[in-house]
Curated annotation (Swiss-Prot):
Name of the gene encoding the protein in the UniProt record: rpoB
EC number: 2.7.7.6
GO biological process, one term: DNA-templated transcription
Protein name: DNA-directed RNA polymerase subunit beta
Family as reported in the entry's similarity comment: Belongs to the RNA polymerase beta chain family.
Keyword list, A-Z: DNA-directed RNA polymerase, Nucleotidyltransferase, Transcription, Transferase
Assembly mode: The RNAP catalytic core consists of 2 alpha, 1 beta, 1 beta' and 1 omega subunit. When a sigma factor is associated with the core the holoenzyme is formed, which can initiate transcription.
GO MF term list: DNA binding; DNA-directed RNA polymerase activity; ribonucleoside binding
GO cellular component, one term: DNA-directed RNA polymerase complex
Function field: DNA-dependent RNA polymerase catalyzes the transcription of DNA into RNA using the four ribonucleoside triphosphates as substrates.
Species annotation: Chlamydia pneumoniae
Record InterPro entries: DNA-dir_RNA_pol_bsu_ext_1_sf (IPR042107), DNA-dir_RNA_pol_bsu_external_1 (IPR019462), DNA-dir_RNA_pol_su2 (IPR015712), DNA-dir_RNAP_su2_dom (IPR007120), DNA-dir_RNAP_su2_hyb_sf (IPR037033), RNA_pol_bsu_bac (IPR010243), RNA_pol_bsu_CS (IPR007121), RNA_pol_bsu_protrusion (IPR007644)
């Protein structure tokens, strides 16, 4: 069995822990959303279940009818993912929901069909209308509370806070220049500000005394004589002081005590007063109490309502319901668990499960936030403003959450429809059932819209396995509820200290999206709240343990973290007394005794693709960014070759991308061919697992997906072994390019400006040859004029043109085609307008339906040539039009199918019985198993399981068995669930096959009779103009393909395969390519593969030692000889092996010339671009160039008849036909457009003919 090569490394110890599953971010999130495989009562209140529980129950307006949600049930997919791609349909499951409706007639339960939900494939993708798509995770501002500061024009710093809910109105509070705090509700209504004290009163703190008690420490001071005045003058009263007998007010809460007031109180016999110990007259709360226009809860509510809804009558009931709706109704205001967690953590409240379940706002939250804001204002060192770009304040919405939000909006729409239907239903004539009120359209339409149109649902980049993997790990700050690329500033795009180990600082696109679209770091995970976590090893008493702790960005700020490269002895203790650490976002040297944690690996900083760049630490960051992005554009080659110099991530990247086939259990290979591998299970050789290989499929980007087996019959394999290679992989390792012998030298000026010179030998050996597959589709429809027909009888076409078409009008597989060739012959009825007048008259008289047809065949577009590799035909079958022979054949086919289905069911039952026996036979029942419906005890506690009991369990449905939680029963539940799913899948497959035999492809679009897809494969060799690149951002275009004999050669006669410009290294500062060249030369000579992981690779000294061991020059430079003259070049040249990739920017796809094509309607100029068969733009600067030469006639031609002179175009055509050499140009259409535009501005411009 072919296994990936052992790579030599200088790294002493492997990483702890191993990398997590790289597409977990997608799979885990969607699994939690759907909770497939869980029983209804076992489902947690998350995902789809949470949405249903939130929206239901729905009550009618008079509350006489109630619709309750009970549970949902997901079906089994009708087709496999591969079949869905082939048919161009969506890979989905049906969603059925059980509702209970209660009205005056009684209680009715019913299961209602709610449409379909797309299902995620094992690779973390969705198949929508036959195309693989990925839902990109979105990074957005976390719900919760943020404290900010801004500078006023007068120089004062104004502090503010925002409480951002997951859903609902934002609440903002900001200090003004007079130290008063104003509340704003929703940013849109910013001008409607409410004094904070008024808002607090409206929340229920009606008296001034209540408010003072919330914000200050209350103390009681005695008032016996005038000696006590000194202590009390200037203090703030905490409560109203009223003489109960006379109702005389001596002082109000919030007032400053004066000598006169104290004298009056002393005279009235008041013995003590309550004061606010830590308050003074300049305190914001005291200032606001003085400014507050209201003095009671009712007045505050009305004032709040008046400011929020000016012009509407401010009644108490209206005001109360408004404030309740805004902040205290869970349907309209929801902080979410995340928002509550952030808010409680910031304000010092509890973060246990009970506290986190409170999703609406509380009075205590507003009071706590205002207290914190005042502490900020007062300069409290423990209070600090938040950094909104810190990852503690940004969270990730993964696929499950994004779709959950869509489902919520769809069901909210449905809620209105349900209420309307309940209201309008006529109970006298019919009985109301759940099916009559529930509409499935709302949910289906939002899901269809999201997967088809959302900015976050993207057509998967499938150029190579790395592109696919990175696309699933991508994080976007764009999309609904996110940022806008035009308005996003530098701060949000920049690398932040909290990104360490969470978001890759290197991999991001160049251009307008820089920093907004990023990638998850290698070890990063997303926690239950959506925050990105990264792992650290725990350090205890100076010893680095193997215990791992995943930490979010805010928790990490409190820890002292050492680098992964810090040196340790054999006891995992630091060898040095000081080391570099990170603490609170800063890096510095510190004593090792203070260290609490340590990085798990140096590569936890970067993403997977960046981690594939060897010697990354020697490259400039800008070039590393280009290197990361260009690896995703590498085209899978015909002959793959793993890099000699790798980083050790190649195996893992290939495995998790889903490109290769990995063994799911131990066993022995029983059968192998190009299409499948059959493995007999180790524990029971009669149980066989078949791995189907993908053969010559077209990827989203037109490249070829092909898997080849790596094992032979009799090979022993263990779980996790690679049993088949895929595109761009070599023995289970990623192989995007080729190891090429390069020389860094100028050569006759051909490698000017990064151009690349390659040897003809690479072309001859098909080193950089790739296969592209193009899909062409044609449909025959039933039109108003008659049916379209796919046929070989095409009018006015010669037999030579039809030579490759079969009897049915479809091209044969294996035919070589070039532009213009017919792939599928089709004729379509001509419409009346296309007929001559006399023909139309005859038709009108004789009433004959259009008999004349026109050619509507599918032809090969310009620029495409290749071999027809596959043809797929989909058609509907009409039972009435079938012949007797066809019906007999169908019956035989159905009989065979039924027999096969019965055998499969029998095999499955046997397999299941064996597993049940192995688990239960002669084991003691840990607890009783009860039948849910009949309440009968199926298995008594302590009973020994015998064959009869096992058979009884086997016959029952899992839903009907009530089992207590214990280890044995958990395994039993899993077995039962797997068996029922497998049985269901077999039944669906059988029914689908039967349907296909009887009715053909019933899922074709309406009106389509037949659909034909033709796949043309073309071999693309490397040619001049193709773009190539290394892994260090060293890109260039092939400028010349040189005969092998003319290439420079070494003293041993070996020719160089590629020549690169040495000037591409110093200014680009990507020295990684030079080190790779040297190490590649040494490793290739030694016949070994090496890995040089990011930040812990081969030191230079080790590379020189390796080169000396292999007898290579120590400086990596050799004398070369000119292939043309045989003379030696004057100076030594750096030569070695470098891994070069061919990128998907092929010249064959870009080169274009227009012969005939469309014109723009307004300007009458040819359109632009290859897709429109457009012309080349001859712009202003090009006109200057011709003017400089003085070529008047050429200029006149280009600006008139070759462009937009409509009459002149016709005349020049006539001249060419007649053989005249004459140019009579007219007025360019663009001149007329200019005049019309000026007239549109109200200027009276008219061209006038003036006699010469």
């Amino acid at each position: 069995m072919l296994k990936c090569p052992e790579r030599v490394s200088v790294k002493k110890k492997e990483d702890i822990p191993d990398l997590p599953n790289l597409i977990e971010i997608q799979i885990k999130s969607y699994k939690q959303f759907l909770q497939i495989g869980k029983l209804a009562e076992e489902r947690e209140n998350i995902g789809l279940e949470e949405v249903f529980r939130e929206i239901f129950p729905i009550k009618s307006y008079n509350e006489a009818t109630v619709l309750e949600y009970l549970s949902y049930n997901l079906g089994v997919p009708k087709y496999s993912p591969e079949e869905c791609i082939r048919r161009g349909i969506t890979y989905s499951v049906t969603l059925k929901v059980r509702f209970r409706l209660t009205d005056e007639t009684g209680i009715k339960e019913e299961e209602v069909y709610m449409g379909t939900i797309p299902l995620m494939t094992d690779k973390g993708t969705f198949i929508i209308n036959g195309a693989e798509r990925v839902v990109v995770s979105q990074v957005h501002r976390s719900p919760g509370i943020n404290f900010e500061q801004e500078k006023h024009s007068k120089g004062n710093i104004l502090f503010s806070f925002r409480i951002i809910p997951y859903r609902g109105s934002w609440l903002e509070a900001i200090f003004d220049i007079n130290d008063l705090i104003y509340i704003h509700i929703d940013r849109k209504k910013r001008r409607r500000k409410i004094l904070a004290i008024t808002f607090i009163r409206a929340l229920g703190y009606s008296s001034d005394a209540d408010i003072i008690e919330e914000f200050f420490t209350i103390g009681e001071s005695s008032l016996r004589s005038e000696k006590d005045f000194a202590l009390l003058v200037g203090r703030i009263l905490a409560d109203n002081i009223i003489d109960e007998a006379s109702s005389l007010v001596y002082g109000k809460a919030g007032e400053k005590l004066s000598t006169a007031m104290l004298k009056r109180m002393l005279d009235a016999g008041i013995a003590s007063v309550k004061i606010a110990v830590d308050a003074d007259e300049n305190h914001p709360i005291i200032k606001m109490l003085a400014k507050d226009p209201t003095d009671s809860y009712e007045a505050a509510l009305k004032d709040f309502y008046r400011r929020l809804r000016p012009g509407e009558p401010a009644t108490l009931a209206n005001a109360r319901s408004t404030i309740m709706r805004l902040f205290f109704d869970p349907k309209r205001y929801n902080l979410g668990r995340v928002g509550r967690y952030k808010l409680n953590r910031k304000l010092g409240f509890s973060i246990d499960d009970e506290a986190l379940s409170q999703v609406t706002l509380r009075k205590e939250d507003v009071i706590g936030a205002l207290k914190y804001l005042i502490r900020l204002k007062m300069g409290d060192e423990k209070a600090c403003v938040d950094d909104i770009d810190h990852l503690a304040n940004r969270r990730v919405r993964s696929v499950g959450e994004l779709i959950q939000n869509q489902c919520r909006s769809g069901l909210a729409r449905m809620e209105k429809i349900v209420r309307e239907r309940m209201n309008l239903f006529d109970f006298s004539s019919d009985t109301l059932t759940p099916g009559k009120v529930v509409s499935a359209k709302g949910l289906a339409s939002v899901l269809k819209d999201f997967f088809g149109r959302s900015q976050l649902s993207q057509f998967m980049d499938q150029t190579n396995p790395v592109a696919e993997l990175t696309h699933k790990r991508r994080l976007s700050a764009l999309g609904p509820g996110g940022l806008n690329r035009e308005r996003a500033g530098f701060e949000v795009r920049d690398v932040h200290a909290s990104h360490y180990g969470r978001i890759c600082p290197i991999e991001t696109p160049e251009g307008p999206n820089i920093g907004l679209i990023t990638s998850l770091s290698s070890f990063a995970k997303i926690n239950e709240f959506g925050f990105i976590e990264t792992p650290y090893r725990i350090v205890r008493d100076g010893i680095v343990t193997d215990e791992i702790e995943y930490m979010t960005a805010d928790v990490e700020e409190e820890c002292v973290i050492a680098q992964a490269s810090a040196s340790l002895d054999e006891y995992n203790m630091f060898t040095e007394p000081v080391c570099w650490v990170r603490y609170a976002g800063e890096a510095f040297e510190a004593d090792t005794s203070t260290v609490t944690h340590m990085d798990v690996s140096p590569k936890q900083l970067v993403s997977i693709v960046t981690g594939l760049i060897p010697f990354l630490e020697h490259d400039d960051a800008n070039r590393a960014l280009m290197g990361s992005n260009m690896q995703r554009q590498a085209v899978p080659l015909l002959k793959t070759e793993a890099p000699v110099v790798g980083t050790g991530l190649e195996c893992r990247a290939a495995k998790d991308s889903g490109a290769i086939v990995v063994a799911e259990e131990d066993g022995v290979v029983d059968f192998v061919d190009g299409y499948k591998v059959v493995v007999a299970a180790k524990h029971n050789p009669t149980i066989k697992r078949t791995y189907h290989l993908k053969k010559f499929l077209r990827s989203n980007s037109g490249t070829c997906i092909n898997q080849q087996p790596l094992c032979a019959v009799g090979d022993v394999i263990t779980k996790g072994d690679v049993i088949a290679d895929g595109p761009a992989t070599d023995r289970g390792e990623l192989a995007l390019g080729k190891n090429v012998l390069v020389a860094f030298m100028p050569w006759y000026g051909y490698n000017f400006e990064d151009a690349i010179i390659i040897s003809e030998k690479l072309i001859r050996e098909d080193a950089y040859t790739s296969i592209y597959i193009e899909e062409f589709e044609l449909t025959a429809r039933d039109t108003k004029l008659g049916k379209e027909e796919i046929t070989r009888d095409i009018p006015n076409v010669s037999d030579e043109v039809l030579a490759n078409l079969g009897e049915d009008g479809i091209i044969r597989i294996g035919a070589e085609v070039k532009p213009g060739d017919i792939l599928v012959g089709k004729i379509t009825p001509k419409s009346e307008t296309e007929l001559a007048p006399e023909e139309r008259l005859l038709r009108a008289i004789f009433g004959e339906k259009a008999a004349d047809v026109k050619d509507a065949s599918l032809t090969v577009p310009p620029g495409t040539e290749g071999v027809v590799m596959d043809v797929k035909v989909f058609s509907r079958k009409d039972r009435l039009s079938k012949s007797d022979d066809e019906l007999v054949e169908e019956a035989v086919h159905l009989k065979d199918l039924q027999k096969g289905y019965k055998n499969q069911v029998a095999t499955l039952k046997t397999e299941y019985r064996e597993k049940l026996g192995a688990l239960l036979l002669n084991e003691k029942a840990p607890a009783a198993i009860i039948h849910r419906r009949t309440a009968e005890i199926v298995v008594h506690e302590g009973l020994l399981f015998d064959q009869e009991t096992i058979e009884r369990i086997e016959q029952e449905d899992l839903v009907d068995l009530l089992m207590p939680n214990c280890e044995m029963y958990e395994v039993l539940k899993g077995l039962l669930s797997d068996y029922e799913t497998a049985l269901q899948r077999l039944e669906i497959n059988y029914k689908t096959e039967v349907e296909h035999i009887r009715e053909g492809d019933a899922d074709l679009d309406h009106g389509v009779i037949r659909q034909v897809k033709v796949y043309v494969a073309s071999k693309r060799k490397l040619q001049v103009g193709d773009k190539m690149a290394g892994r260090h951002g060293n890109k260039g275009v092939v400028s010349k393909i040189v005969p092998e004999a003319d290439m420079p050669y070494l003293s041993n006669g070996e020719t160089v395969q590629m020549i690169l410009n040495p000037l591409g290294v110093p200014s680009r500062m990507n020295l990684g390519q030079v080190l790779e060249t040297h190490l590649g030369y040494a490793a290739k000579t030694a016949g070994i593969y090496v890995k040089t992981p990011v930040f812990e690779g081969f030191p230079e000294q080790r590379i020189w030692d390796m080169m000396i061991e292999q007898g290579l020059p120590e400086d990596g430079k050799s004398f070369l000889y000119d292939g043309k003259t045989g003379e030696r070049f004057d100076n030594k040249v750096v030569i070695g092996y470098i891994y070069m990739l061919k990128l998907s920017h092929l010249i064959a796809d870009k080169i274009h010339a227009r012969s005939i094509g469309p014109y723009s309607l307004v300007t009458q100029q040819p359109l632009g671009g290859k897709a429109q068969m457009g012309g080349q733009r001859f712009g202003e600067m090009e006109v200057w160039a011709l003017e400089a030469y003085g070529v008047a006639h050429m200029l006149q031609e280009i600006l008139t008849v070759k462009s937009d002179d409509v009459s002149g175009r016709t005349r020049i055509y006539e001249s060419i036909v007649k053989g005249e050499n004459l140019l009579r140009s007219g007025t360019p259409e663009s001149f007329n457009v200019l005049i019309k535009e000026m007239q549109g501005l109200g200027l009276d411009v008219r061209p006038m003919v003036v006699d010469a």
